[in-house]
Amino acid sequence: MRVKINLECSECGSNNYLTSKNKSSHPEKIKVPKYCPKERKVTLHVET
């Protein structure tokens, strides 16, 4: 089952990305390095 998730910047707290994941095969939270336009650099984004 795929669910929609938000990715939140770990430094500034803004929700920058919307994605989906398969919850049955990946039950853990996603942590992905992505570009944050507010910080203007690549930061770690975590699932909210």
UniProtKB/Swiss-Prot annotation:
Pfam (any one): Ribosomal_L33
UniProt cross-references to InterPro entries, sorted A to Z: Ribosomal_bL33, Ribosomal_bL33_sf, Ribosomal_zn-bd
TM region(s), chain numbering: none
Disulfide bonds: none
A GO biological-process term: translation
Entry GO MF terms: structural constituent of ribosome
SUPFAM superfamilies documented for this protein: Zn-binding ribosomal proteins
GO cellular component, one term: cytoplasm
UniProt KW keywords: Ribonucleoprotein, Ribosomal protein
Stored Gene3D superfamilies: Ribosomal protein L33
NCBIfam families: PRK00504.1, PRK00595.1, rpmG_bact
Similarity annotation: Belongs to the bacterial ribosomal protein bL33 family.
Name under which the protein is recorded: Large ribosomal subunit protein bL33A
Name of the coding gene: rpmG1
